[in-house]
């Protein structure tokens, strides 16, 4: 009986690791779909999967997937100087989105309440992204350059909020995916 339990734990750990790697790849891929911003940096669709990583994988695995996938995309896109900040900012986004979403939605079965909880959680996560990059760019460049990226980061945040809210709603209603993500 004990060997069976150990095998289940190893399989569960392996499944989480593989799922986190998949989400890191999704974060990487969607971050690579980027548009250079006029002042500094670039806008992308990676925030959608950063938020989904937090909601679906939990704070530890979600933060690891979000931080690693997006930081590697920074390096691949030639923004290696941003990679350390991106790792921290996106990991924090995933953690905050997880805890706020969990706190607000709880075990509610009411779809409207769950969607609202995820939207509020996404907004809080995106505030961390906007504030985090503003602070980093203020130190790296100056406040004027950092202020110039606020509009682009805000548009990126809005896209991340909308896309992640739509996708989490679709995922929650999918019977197939509830086996992969039993906490839904």
Per-range role (PLM):
Residues 1-184:
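Loop-helix junctions at membrane interfaces
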């Amino acid at each position: 009986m004990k060997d069976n339990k150990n095998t289940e734990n190893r399989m569960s750990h392996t499944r989480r690791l593989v799922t986190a790697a998949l989400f890191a790849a999704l974060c990487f891929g969607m971050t690579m779909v980027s548009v250079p911003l006029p002042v500094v940096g670039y806008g992308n669709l990676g925030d959608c999967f950063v938020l989904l990583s937090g909601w679906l994988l939990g704070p530890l695995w979600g933060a690891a997937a979000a931080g690693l996938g997006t930081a590697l995309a920074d390096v691949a896109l030639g923004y290696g100087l941003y990679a350390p900040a991106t790792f921290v900012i996106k990991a924090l986004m995933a953690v905050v989105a997880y805890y706020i979403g969990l706190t607000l939605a709880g075990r509610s079965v009411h779809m409207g309440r769950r969607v609202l909880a995820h939207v509020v959680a996404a907004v809080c996560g995106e505030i961390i992204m906007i504030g985090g990059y503003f602070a980093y760019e203020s130190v790296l460049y100056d406040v004027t350059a950092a202020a110039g990226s606020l509009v682009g980061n805000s548009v990126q945040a809005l896209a991340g909020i909308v896309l992640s809210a739509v996708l989490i709603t679709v995922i929650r209603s999918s019977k197939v995916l509830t086996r992969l993500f039993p906490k839904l």
